[in-house]
From Swiss-Prot:
Catalytic activity: Endonucleolytic cleavage of RNA, removing 5'-extranucleotides from tRNA precursor
Designated name of the protein: Ribonuclease P protein component
InterPro entries: Ribosomal_Su5_D2-typ_SF, Ribsml_uS5_D2-typ_fold_subgr, RNase_P, RNase_P_CS
Gene name of this polypeptide: rnpA
Pfam families attached to this UniProt entry: Ribonuclease_P (PF00825)
Family membership: Belongs to the RnpA family.
Region (Disordered): 119-145
Length: 145
């Protein structure tokens, strides 16, 4: 569990924590949404920080709300090194209560890509970048043109 290994915990510096910070994000941020989640983001020069809002309207049981937050924190922890700087607040929607953990994680990654916070994945089946081939020296048997 994360409590036994402090290196695996989600650091305080990577969280939106106070009401004032949430208010700034909600008032000045751009928004994009998915059937499961809504993302409010504000770009900046600061390291990326995550805030979550999972209300009782989403799931009346604390177990369900905590599961959603746990999945989002874990996904954010893995994406933190490649994430653009700024504040990101995720608002869970009621459909998230019935979604599986991979569905929630995929929706989160999809929203971050749509926001431009993550690089787009390479399209499957695309060719790798072309290598530059240096012209070889002419062979002594072939005539030069």
């Amino acid at each position: 569990m994360n409590a036994s290994n402090p290196c695996r915990r989600f650091p305080r510096s990577a969280r939106v924590r106070t009401r004032a910070q949430y208010t700034i994000v909600f008032d000045t941020a751009r928004r994009t949404s998915d059937p499961l989640l809504s993302l409010h983001w504000r770009t900046g020069d600061t390291p990326p920080r995550l805030g979550m809002a999972v209300s009782r309207k989403v799931d009346t049981r604390a177990v369900g709300r905590n599961r959603i937050k746990r999945v989002l924190r874990d996904a954010m922890r893995h994406l933190l090194p490649e994430l653009a700087g700024g504040d990101y607040v995720i608002v869970a929607r009621s459909a998230a209560a019935k979604a599986t953990n991979p569905q929630i994680r995929d929706a989160f990654v999809r929203l971050l890509r749509r926001a431009g916070a993550l690089p787009l994945p390479a399209a499957p089946g695309t060719m790798p970048p072309a290598r530059t081939v240096r012209p070889s020296s002419p062979s002594p048997t072939e005539p030069e043109l």
